[in-house]
């Protein structure tokens, strides 16, 4: 992704009033005096409200359709929102704690809107053990028969290799020459094991995506980064996020073989996928210098490890 080769598409922007009108057209009428903005991340606007029957609901919609940034170029937010709807339903049907999907509206001329139950939260966090147990349950499921937005119809190893390489190019554009970086072909070869025994991976397991009450996980949200691949890819991300604690390992029933695999070639390449994303996020999108510097240091460490492997 040195310089995006495709022109960005014209953007239509939508307001809260536009989203509320979609609900009104479908006989779901939020009370305007109850609307309250929630943290929506990068892709979506999220509001809590009460409907005409005084039920607490959450509405989630994009204020524009297309994602254009150095991490993701030309991603369709409508597809992301549909994926969120589908994966919340899938996860809920299989015992993963998630908010219930109330409705999904896709009008021809307005924003698509996802309506969810509102889960009351109190600012507490779940234990790492509970997160480990939940992730183990998720990874034990046969994956749904769908293509995720992040992966499309490509095999996991190639898509992860391609995204890693593109983001390495972005990093070089921003900080200068990295001296050495693996090619897409080299990364694809290292990552080939993630194509076997593929499972649904959430790929953004962090406190911002945990809806909690009384230190219990009540809802796992934001499935935008989901992939279908071998769980080592998610475990590597959790490790680089700093979440692979002994308590998580206990809940997940992490074996010594799983743990050691994270420090071999495939595991290092999986870690690299997360670190390049974080580098671009902190360098180009959030512009957080201290965090960017820490991730750049980690990036160089991982590149050094990969550069000395016999598989390259």
Language-model-detected regions and their locations in the chain:
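Phosphate/pyrophosphate-binding loops and the adjoining catalytic core of nucleotide-dependent enzymes
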Residues: 1-13, 310
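ATP-binding pocket architecture of kinase catalytic cores
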Residues: 36-43, 47-152
